[in-house]
Amino acid sequence: MKKIVYTLLILTTVFMSCSKWTETEDNKDDFEKAALENLKEKRDAAKWIAEAERTEENKKALDAYWKMLSDYKEKAWLNTGEAGGQVPMNYFWFSGGFWTTQKGVAKTWLQSIPDSVVAISIWGGLGTRPEKISDYQKKDLEIFHKKGSKVLMCWQTPSVGLGLPTSKDGSLSGFDLFHQKYPYAECYAQWPEIYARELARYIISLNFDGYDVDWETCGDHGAVTKEGTPLMISDNNYENIGKFVKEMAKYFGPVGAGHLVTTQAEREANLKALFTASTSGFHPKEAEYIAEFTPYLPANYLTKRYYFCCDIPCTPYPPVFVTGNIEKYFDKHFLQNYNSETYTPSPGWTSPDMDRLGGKYYNSAGSNYQAGNFKVALTKAKAVKEGKVWGIAAYHGQTDYEITHENNEQFKKYLRDNNLKRKYLHYAFTREASRIMDPRPDYSGYVEKEPMIILP
């Protein structure tokens, strides 16, 4: 997509003293010099004004481009199919430690992610309190949002307290702080709801856009115990993870008929209550995060759209995740079928089963970029083009930044096999997959450029 670069100009006007125009004839040289200076200043001012007008035109064009991107990406969150205007989802699980916004290192900025990517999740968490977010990160997030892209958080979610920030003095991890405030013996029954609220408060205070629940019975979280992994406990048909989902869905996820939250007014009331310490049913210790995070709430936090997604790679599927229920709570499901070439489970697996997890409109087929298996993203993109599934997702999507049209054997083979000539400086697989899923009518004006990074 064409990128329009604009420069903000500082306009200055230099005013001449009137006394220069009342000098005596004896100061003729000074008079002529002053007149020439005045003409030069008027000429330069005119040039500056012309530049300012061009700058304003470019700014308007850039704003229009961002609006176009945002409108397009909103349609990726639909679950209606083509008849309702849905367009393909393009999603990254993005390493939390990679987002460092280093000056001169474009790949560490969200702005370097292709404009076709609808959303990312910060995989593994961020570990940063809202007051510690840098000015560079704030600007990066601002521009990423202007493009219509969303930032969620995501990690395997077997336990409570995971992913929360350290204590204010840095002496306790978020996990340890949670368990100190809400001891197992006293709070086990309320743990799922308390964790959902504390996590929602943290995400909102960062000006992020939601949460992606990675719930894996085949995950690497060790033995299942009530104190250690309460959200994996199967009691009462997986009641604990159900409680977590239902509480989180009050604040994040779809709104309207057929969903847990049926009106925007109800969603706004829930968000307001989330940051009100006196809300009925809240634990007294919840007042601590409320007090600490409220100063960092975005101005639009009550009306902002927050998203709730999930990835359930293996059986059994708790009731909240299955077709018929998943639509009530979640916006999207992402398939961890990394070794499959389409939407089906990986060879040797029977899960994840797309039809049991929301169906094709809710789902995106996953690729494991971290493992180097990039090429399946392109065959999965073809499945999207054929309407068999409605998006792609890349685990550790940021690793594709380094891949060009000429430095990766998988990509070069793809070009040869398909008799194609492409030129990509970064994110070759991601961008080619986007081109397959939903191609533009015309690429004749396309020019390959380095990513544009706007600094504070």
Region roles according to the model:
Residues M1-D26:
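Bacterial Sec-dependent N-terminal signal peptides
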Residues C18-P456:
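Secreted glycan hydrolases and related glycan-binding modules that recognize and/or cleave
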